[in-house]
């Protein structure tokens, strides 16, 4: 993958001596939501593609030759239960039954929250702009990549440990946060 989130993770800058442990932890703990593949582990091989999760295909011929038991109008309806089932299966082996959500709202909507067997902690990155706290898209994307890198480097195994994240001017804001939404602010 390329883009602001992945560039901020700076995988190519991981020192050779720690790379095997870095990749092992990432492979066991990081999941990537994909419009084409559904859910991926960091080392899964993929073909280059451009397909957004929000792509609609009402009356499309995409699935015409496939034997599907139901019609899907978009990628959310296609992936919803499949992604949720994988996450439910994988969370069984984790002591902290919490998913730290670093996905964009667009991609996170692909998870069926009514069927997920885990706590969800949404990570939100905000900045002070015109005397208001706002999410600035490009900055939030980079911050999500930095947070993913922090989780891997620090080998985070409990969601509360992410409150120690400090990068690119962001730090945890307890006053704006609650049990399900961790807000990181940069002034």
Spans of model-derived segments:
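Internal, well-folded beta-alpha domain core
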Residues: 14-178, 183-187
């Amino acid at each position: 993958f390329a883009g602001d989130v992945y560039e901020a993770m700076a995988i190519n800058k991981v020192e050779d001596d720690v790379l095997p442990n870095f990749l092992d932890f990432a492979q066991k703990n990081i999941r990537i939501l994909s419009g084409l593949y559904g859910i991926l582990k960091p080392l899964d091989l993929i073909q280059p593609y451009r397909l957004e999760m929000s792509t609609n295909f009402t009356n499309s011929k995409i699935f015409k030759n496939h034997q599907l038991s139901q019609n899907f109008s978009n990628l959310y309806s296609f992936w919803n239960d499949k992604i949720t089932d994988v996450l439910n299966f994988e969370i069984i082996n984790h002591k902290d039954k919490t998913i730290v959500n670093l996905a964009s709202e667009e991609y996170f909507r692909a998870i069926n929250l009514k069927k997920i067997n885990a706590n969800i902690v949404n990570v939100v990155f905000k900045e002070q702009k015109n005397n208001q706290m706002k999410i600035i898209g490009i900055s939030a994307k980079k911050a999500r990549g930095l947070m993913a890198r922090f989780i891997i480097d620090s080998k985070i195994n409990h969601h509360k440990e992410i409150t120690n994240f400090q990068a690119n001017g962001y730090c945890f804001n307890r006053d704006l946060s609650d049990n399900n939404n961790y807000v990181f602010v940069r002034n």
